[in-house]
Amino acid sequence: VKTSVVICVYTEERWEDIRQAVESVGNQTRQPHELILVVDHNPDLLLKLKRAYPQAVVVENTHEKGLSGGKNTGVDVATGDIVAYLDDDAVADPWWLEALEEGFQEPGVVGVGGRTEPLWASKRRPRWFPYEFDWTVGCTYRGMPEVRAPIRNVMGGNAAFLREVVSEVGGFHSGIGRSVQGRKSRPLGCEETEFCIRLSQRKPGSVMLFEPRAVIGHKVSRQRERFAYFRSRCYAEGLSKALVTREVGTQDGLSSERAHAMKTLPLGALRGLGEALRGDVGGLGRAFAIVVGLAWTTWGYVVGSARLKAVRS
């Protein structure tokens, strides 16, 4: 099997992050068929990367500006059987690619996602930050499987798909978040969720697999360690989910979220209160953050749904 690894990049400010991401791909126990660096409409960075990495395939994003356009460009250029995506601010463990590839040996598997661990800029997790909400910083969260298991959708920065299947279903949708943005630009990260559900709907029997042995570390900036970002990201996720349900329907679009909200989050809040009673003051903060996170996400969903109805009418 041949795997093309795609890293989408956009700014020189992340040069050191990009360097570490590329280095981690070079240190894999199973080397990729090719490494593709897709540059998002930044000619200076494109030239710099071509000079620094002559062994890589360095190309310009030929689709609409943004991460989805970059991912689609990667699929267009790739010649491998599998396309694996790694965030430009992530570092893959040496056995990451090997574990992803092994996941495709399971029957019906068209996509495999790995485990993403946070690399905190402050070197430690904020005491108030609940594990149930690690998705707000692009990481695997409490409530996801702990062993290899089918899941509804993978997380975009640590995932692999059969190349032909991505093309068959039309790739990743660009800019689907614009109609609910409002006056403020927000990080609407719903593209991979919508893509995975759309793929499963169009190709019944297709399996998305979670493979916890495919591990990467994802860097979390100090700004993203703040409670203000946490709230904003939760609200943006609610807006995103309104879009996802418009595209793929409420039943599929909210199935995982309902289970998380009805079971995992209440247990997490109770756990935090219990830890606070046992002397861990941070437990109170985690319980509070779970309540706020759920409320802000729900409010975002309500606002997003209302904006979509207004656009339709």
Where are these regions (language model features)?
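N-proximal low-complexity "stem/linker" segments adjacent to membrane-targeting elements
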Residues: 1-24
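Glycine-rich, basic loop-to-helix element that forms the pyrophosphate-binding segment
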Residues: 61-78
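Conserved donor NDP-sugar-binding/catalytic core segment of glycosyltransferases
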Residues: 95-128
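Short aromatic/hydrophobic "clamp" motif used to bind/position activated sugar donors
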Residues: 83
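Short, acidic, metal-binding catalytic loop of nucleotide-sugar glycosyltransferases
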Residues: 22-32
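Short, flexible, basic/aromatic active-site loop/helix in glycosyltransferases
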Residues: 130-151
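A short, conserved alpha-helix in the catalytic core of glycosyltransferases
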Residues: 158-161, 165-170, 176-214
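Non-catalytic, C-terminal membrane-associated alpha-helical segments of glycosyltransferases
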Residues: 232-236, 250-313
